[in-house]
Amino acid sequence: ALDIGCGTGNLAIPLAKRLRRVDALDFSAGMLRQLEENRRAAGVDNLRVHALSWTDSWEAVPVADLVICSRALGVEDLRGALEKMTRWARRRCYATLHAAGDFLGDDVRAALGREVAPRPGYIYAVNMLYQMGFPARVDFLKSTGGMTYADAGQFLEAVRWRIGGLSAADERRLGRVFGALPQTGDGRRRYRHEFVWALLSWEKPGP
């Protein structure tokens, strides 16, 4: 199997316990360092790690019967990423993409007082795959999660990453939102959000 955008190994390590070999690919050195620690702790020795991005050459990465990509298709060239996934698969691909919900909840949107343009959703990928000759099956997964922040600055930076620039008035209002968030045991504040993810799967026809 090949896990693209493997992060710290949440999928790659369990897969490696069940399969003969797993290749895990991510561009983040920090994520891969944590994956190596998690791999050793799990006693897994059939997991190969590749420090690569979507745009790098994958010449050293072997093709696999199964290719997965969980929440790592937020790329500029979505069609190119889907094509690359499919080229590296012998049999089947799975990918999860955003379907509904957002990091920016109603409280943040109200504080900003303006509409935030949604990001391209899963339907773009479904249409692209259909055009490529791979009609995808779609299932939906609900997810409740959240992030913790040590201070308002971290929270503001997370919002800024999502929407771009913030005015001084935006920062003041968002600071009040942050101050009202529940605290965790270590004094950080937790922002909760809910998502719906689309699980896309498609097969490659045999030779």
Predicted feature residues:
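A short SAM/SAH-binding and catalytic strip from SAM-dependent methyltransferases
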Residues: 65-79
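Short, glycine-/aromatic-enriched active-site segment of Class I SAM-dependent methyltransferases
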Residues: 98-116
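Short alpha-helix
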Residues: 118-133
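Conserved Class I S-adenosyl-L-methionine
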Residues: 137-207
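Class I SAM-dependent methyltransferase "Motif I" SAM/SAH-binding loop
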Residues: 5-7
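Class I SAM-dependent methyltransferase SAM/SAH-binding core
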Residues: 10, 17-55
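Short conserved loop adjoining the S-adenosyl-L-methionine
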Residues: 56-61
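Conserved beta-strand signature within the Rossmann-like core of class I S-adenosyl-L-methionine
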Residues: 90-100
